Every structure is written in structure tokens, then in C-alpha cells.
């Protein structure tokens, strides 16, 4: 229903999905292992990649053939990919500082950094969603259909689903609660946000999947499914409370990979296109051919799920706000839930004493940690 995953390449398409999923989990485990691996992943490697990208783009603009024919220069030149790459990376780098209490990471005022950088990342996507909606509407008026060609040679189909999902993204920002409730785990491997429970994660995942499905169409099999499932899987089974760190780390790693190897996504046996492209056209991306037909049904369905799920979460937050008479953005609002308590049990001793002092609840008082 959502993707064209059949035919002679179906084995490789599913194999690619599994490899990306496992690869993201393993590289996230490497990144969270120690301060050294964290700085290697989000400072050392990004510096090297930045130098490479700088020379590729400069040489491409100067007309050097090797750069003009480079897949990164051709397929990853849009503002979104660069904004996302560096926004995700500085987010992960900030998380390393917080969990190890290095430099500004040891100050309480910096605890709001996770909220700030996640909000920025969401807004980047929201702007992109609205951009697609506007360009789709303009082309419908001028050319009679909603197709528009991105700077990276990908045909996108903008419509009301982008508007709906953009609104859902704005709501999602305010579904993040207890902005200063950020702590280190006992083993210092993880930055924990206990009040970011499954409700937010579900709403975020649906919203972000719809974003990738509408705007990163030829990449969404990987960055819309595998990339979202990897941090959620880790959070569910062994890294409770660390979802936002998992998400930032895997997103940073994925953006670096995609920026360097776009051919894996666009023109290989692993490439997958969504059902938006009504008929599977194997040369769709490679030859920049305008699709002959569109089926935006799935885009519309997921957009509705996105807005409904985010409205549901924000209503839950407001309901708890009224019942508890506590600001959900400066206080925990879900600290009576199992999700919160599972994360709380992983918090280091110094931070738990701070929570008991500032965030009293019967569940926390009953724990003997």
C-alpha cells in the first residue's frame, strides 16, 4: 500500500532495510559508549565530512567535472539536507556534553537544549512541508497538476496533506513536556528525558514518517521507516528514557551516510519508491522524468493520522495540566506512568535527589534507589 517493494529487486529492498536498521542501532551503540566515541561520531567525523562537502561544492561551482558528476553535488544540494545534517549533529554533540556534564553541559540552563534543538529540527521539516504545499498549489493553477521538481531532481506532489502535517508538526513541538527535566543515567552512557513517554514518541513517529513520505519520497523507505524504528526499538528494549538521544544520534549518522552515498537510495538495487508514483517506473529518479500518474491516497491517510495523534497527545497534556495545576513545560506531567518510572530508575544518584526535591510524586517517594 505504501511502497513499491516487489519485483526483481524486492529481496534487496528488504535486505537494505534490515542492514540500515541494524547499522543504525550498532552505530548508535558505538556513539553512546563513551565521551571519546561520542566526540568521534559527532565532532571528528562531521569535521572531515564538512571539509569534503566544502570542496565538492566549490569544485562543482567552478566547473570541475569530477565534482559536477559527484552524486552528492547532484542529488543532495537542497537546503533541507544540509540544515538537517548540521542541526541533528549539533543536537547530538550537545547531548554528549549534557550526559557527561562537560563544559556548558554541566549547567542547569543548558538542560533546555534538547527541547530547543528538537523544536528547530521539527520547524525545519514544517517549513519544507509548507514549501511543498505552496509549490504544488502553484503548479496546479499553472500546469494543471501538483507535481514539482526539487533542486535534487526528485518529483514531489504537494497538497493539503503537507499543510495538515505541517500543523501537526507545530503541535508536536508543544507535546514535549518538562523541558528542563533532563538527566544522566547511572553509567553516564545516556542522556535521559523521563517525561518524553510513549505518547509523544508515537505522535512524533507518525508525523515524521508522513513528512519523509511526502518530501523525501525516494528515501522514505529508509529514513521514514528504518530510521524511525531504530531509536524506538532501542528505547523500548534497553534504553528507556533515552529515546531522544537515540533519535538524534541515528538521525545524525543517517544524514552523514545519505549525504555521502545518495546513489544507495536513488539508483541502486536497494532503491524504493512510494506508492505515490502510481506505476513503478524504474528510471523515475535517474532520468528526472516526470511521473505519468499520482496516487496521493496514502499521503492523505497518514496526514490525518498525524494530526489526530498529535491533537490527542496535546489534549492529554492539557487535561493533566488542568487536573494537576502544574505547568507541563517546567514540570513533569507523566511522572505517574510506568514509562516515566522505568526511565527514572536509570537516573544517577545526584539527579534522583534533585527530582525527589523538586518533583515529588507518590511513585517516586516509594522507590528505594
Residue ranges and their predicted role:
Residues 2-103:
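An N-terminal, globular interaction/scaffold subdomain
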Residues 29-39, 100-111, 236-249:
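Membrane-helix interface "capping/anchor" motifs
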Residues 25-29, 45-63, 91-102, 117-132, ...:
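Hydrophobic alpha-helical transmembrane segments and adjacent interfacial helices
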Residues 105-241:
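Generic multipass alpha-helical transmembrane bundles of integral membrane proteins
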Residues 1-2, 62-77, 131-155, 268-293:
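Membrane-interfacial helical/loop segments at transmembrane boundaries in membrane proteins
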Residues 4-7, 72, 102-105, 152, ...:
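Juxtamembrane loop-transmembrane helix junctions in multi-pass integral membrane proteins
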Residues 8-18, 41-49, 74-93, 108-125, ...:
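Alpha-helical transmembrane segments of polytopic membrane proteins
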Residues 13, 17-25, 223-365:
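C-terminal transmembrane-bundle signature of multipass membrane proteins
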Amino acid at each position: 500500500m505504501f511502497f513499491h517493494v516487489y519485483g526483481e529487486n524486492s529481496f534487496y529492498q528488504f535486505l537494505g532495510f534490515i542492514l540500515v536498521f541494524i547499522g543504525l542501532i550498532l552505530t548508535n551503540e558505538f556513539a553512546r559508549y563513551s565521551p571519546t566515541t561520542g566526540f568521534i561520531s559527532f565532532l571528528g567525523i562531521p569535521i572531515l565530512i564538512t571539509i569534503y562537502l566544502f570542496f565538492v561544492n566549490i569544485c562543482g561551482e567552478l566547473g570541475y567535472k569530477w565534482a559536477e558528476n559527484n552524486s552528492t553535488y547532484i542529488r543532495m544540494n537542497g537546503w533541507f539536507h544540509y540544515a538537517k545534517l548540521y542541526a541533528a549533529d549539533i543536537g547530538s554533540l550537545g547531548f554528549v556534553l549534557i550526559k557527561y556534564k562537560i563544559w556548558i553541559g554541566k549547567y542547569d540552563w543548558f538542560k533546555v537544549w534538547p527541547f530547543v534543538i528538537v523544536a528547530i529540527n521539527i520547524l525545519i521539516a514544517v517549513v519544507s512541508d509548507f514549501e511543498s504545499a505552496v509549490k504544488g498549489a502553484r503548479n496546479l493553477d499553472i500546469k494543471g497538476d501538483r507535481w514539482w521538481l526539487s533542486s535534487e531532481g526528485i518529483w514531489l506532489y504537494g497538497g493539503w496533506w503537507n499543510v495538515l502535517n505541517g500543523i501537526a508538526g507545530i503541535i508536536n513541538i508543544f507535546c514535549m513536556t518538562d523541558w528542563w527535566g533532563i538527566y544522566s543515567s547511572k553509567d553516564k552512557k545516556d542522556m535521559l528525558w523521563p517525561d518524553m513517554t510513549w505518547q509523544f514518541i508515537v505522535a512524533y513517529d507518525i508525523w515524521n514518517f508522513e513528512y519523509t513520505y511526502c518530501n523525501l519520497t525516494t528515501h522514505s523507505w529508509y529514513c521514514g521507516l528504518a530510521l524511525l524504528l531504530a531509536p524506538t526499538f532501542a528505547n523500548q528494549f534497553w534504553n528507556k528514557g533515552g529515546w531522544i538521544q537515540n533519535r538524534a544520534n541515528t538521525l545524525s549518522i543517517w544524514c552523514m551516510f545519505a549525504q555521502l552515498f545518495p546513489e544507495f537510495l536513488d539508483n541502486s538495487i536497494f532503491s524504493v519508491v512510494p506508492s505515490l508514483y502510481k506505476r513503478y517506473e524504474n528510471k523515475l529518479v535517474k532520468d528526472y522524468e516526470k511521473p505519468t500518474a499520482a496516487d496521493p491516497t496514502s499521503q492523505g491517510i497518514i496526514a490525518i493520522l498525524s494530526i489526530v495523534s498529535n491533537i490527542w497527545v496535546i489534549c492529554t497534556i492539557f487535561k493533566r495540566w488542568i487536573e494537576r495545576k502544574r505547568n507541563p513545560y517546567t514540570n513533569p506531567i507523566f511522572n505517574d506512568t510506568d514509562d516515566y518510572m522505568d526511565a527514572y530508575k536509570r537516573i544517577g544518584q545526584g539527579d534522583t535527589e534533585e527530582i525527589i526535591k523538586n518533583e515529588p510524586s507518590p511513585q517516586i517517594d516509594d522507590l528505594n534507589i
